[in-house]
């Protein structure tokens, strides 16, 4: 993938860029693997906003991705197409299995149309193959990693993401996460070899607010420019700093949003670097 930059023909085009989609081999999805996707606008069943800054955006169809490939162990598949997925930053690969079934997976870096991929404990160590961590050599970069055996891929699924397998000791494997955190995971958990493709996506300059609205992202308004009725930082004459430590619209101090005593924390060997004092 490469980035195509626009000439500054308008203020919105100045500095903006877009993917050249050179890796994409088909412009429409597999019909049997598409489901309707209804926008919620960040609202719950009562109609109240529970997630801010969401709403609108272009209509999308959901592509069903296979995050549990254990039921295809020993069945080879051919990469029929590399496709664009509007629901994620990574591209997706359409697999045609020898038994006739078709499935989507996240497309790793270097996976080409016509390649053969497989899953299972005896699979080769090459991009796109899925196998348990116990069968992957230390130092290998992987993605789409399970947190629990059979639970489906949860970690490192976005464009350019990868996890490094540092080593194995007993029934646990040590992984270096994209955040820098080192975590222990059961060696029976599965992972896909290689890095997620489309890494240049992070370098796209969106150029104008309208492109964010196409993606379903609404504006983020600072509390200091609101009225006192809307935010604890609101009000004041002229430009003010808020007059207190940063808080949420409901008065809770910023940061420290994670559960302090999560059960799985005992599997974290080294925490991610946050730059904040704990």
From Swiss-Prot:
Q: Where is the composition biased (Basic residues)?
A: 37-58, 269-278
Q: Give the UniProt keywords, A-Z.
A: Ribonucleoprotein, Ribosomal protein, RNA-binding, rRNA-binding
Biological process terms in GO annotation: cytoplasmic translation
Asked if the Swiss-Prot or TrEMBL record annotates the protein with the keyword Ribonucleoprotein, the reply is yes
Please tell me the species this chain comes from.
Answer: Mycolicibacterium vanbaalenii (strain DSM 7251 / JCM 13017 / BCRC 16820 / KCTC 9966 / NRRL B-24157 / PYR-1)
Residue ranges, compositional bias (Basic and acidic residues): 23-33, 253-268
Record protein name field: Large ribosomal subunit protein uL2
Provide the residue span(s) of the region labelled Disordered. 1-58, 224-278
Q: How does it assemble?
A: Part of the 50S ribosomal subunit. Forms a bridge to the 30S subunit in the 70S ribosome.
**Entry-linked InterPro entries:** NA-bd_OB-fold, Rib_uL2_dom2, Ribosomal_uL2, Ribosomal_uL2_bac/org-type, Ribosomal_uL2_C, Ribosomal_uL2_CS, Ribosomal_uL2_dom3, Ribosomal_uL2_RNA-bd_dom
SUPFAM superfamilies xrefs: Nucleic acid-binding proteins, Translation proteins SH3-like domain
What this protein is reported to do is described as: One of the primary rRNA binding proteins. Required for association of the 30S and 50S subunits to form the 70S ribosome, for tRNA binding and peptide bond formation. It has been suggested to have peptidyltransferase activity; this is somewhat controversial. Makes several contacts with the 16S rRNA in the 70S ribosome.
Q: Name one Pfam family in it.
A: Ribosomal_L2
